[in-house]
């Protein structure tokens, strides 16, 4: 009876870790960083190896050139202010 209680307690403690594991796997898959290594396919001639080599080759060939598409805007120049007629308190 004690063993069954221990097993239920131990399995209950693993639930948060399983949830965390599943969440991390989903996030890594979305980012493209998750590579699952299954123990049954340990043969050296797997189809994953050539794909990885092709990805490496394309990563080396890709270059990013940053250019600016913005046009330079010239500031508007103000003309000279008109000289007042000499009458105080009046505006043009």
Curated annotation (Swiss-Prot):
Similarity comment: Belongs to the brassicaceae elicitor peptide family.
The UniProt record lists the keyword Plastid: no
Subunit structure: Interacts with its receptor PEPR1.
Triggers of expression: By wounding, methyl jasmonate (MeJA), ethylene. The expression of the peptide PEP1 precursor is induced by the mature peptide PEP1.
Protein purpose: Elicitor of plant defense. Induces the production of plant defensin (PDF1.2) and of H(2)O(2). Promotes resistance to the root fungal pathogen P.irregulare. Triggers the expression of several PROSCOOP genes (e.g. PROSCOOP2, PROSCOOP7, PROSCOOP8, PROSCOOP12 and PROSCOOP13).
Protein name: Precursor of elicitor peptide 1
Keywords: Plant defense
Biased composition (Basic and acidic residues): 49-64
Residue span of region Disordered: 35-92
GO biological process, one term: response to jasmonic acid
Keyword Glycosyltransferase found: no
Gene source species: Arabidopsis thaliana (Mouse-ear cress)
Site feature (Required for ligand-receptor interaction) residues: 86
Domain of life (superkingdom): Eukaryota
Alphabetized Pfam families for the sequence: Pep1_7
Biased composition (Polar residues): 37-48
């Amino acid at each position: 009876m004690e063993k069954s209680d221990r097993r239920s307690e131990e399995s209950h403690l693993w639930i948060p870790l399983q949830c965390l594991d599943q969440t991390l796997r989903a996030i890594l898959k979305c980012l493209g960083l998750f590579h699952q290594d299954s123990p049954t396919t340990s043969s050296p001639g797997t189809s994953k190896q050539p794909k990885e080599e092709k990805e490496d080759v394309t990563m080396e060939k890709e270059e990013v050139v940053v250019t600016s598409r913005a046009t330079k805007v010239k500031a508007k120049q103000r003309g000279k202010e008109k000289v007042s007629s000499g009458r105080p308190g009046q505006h043009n």
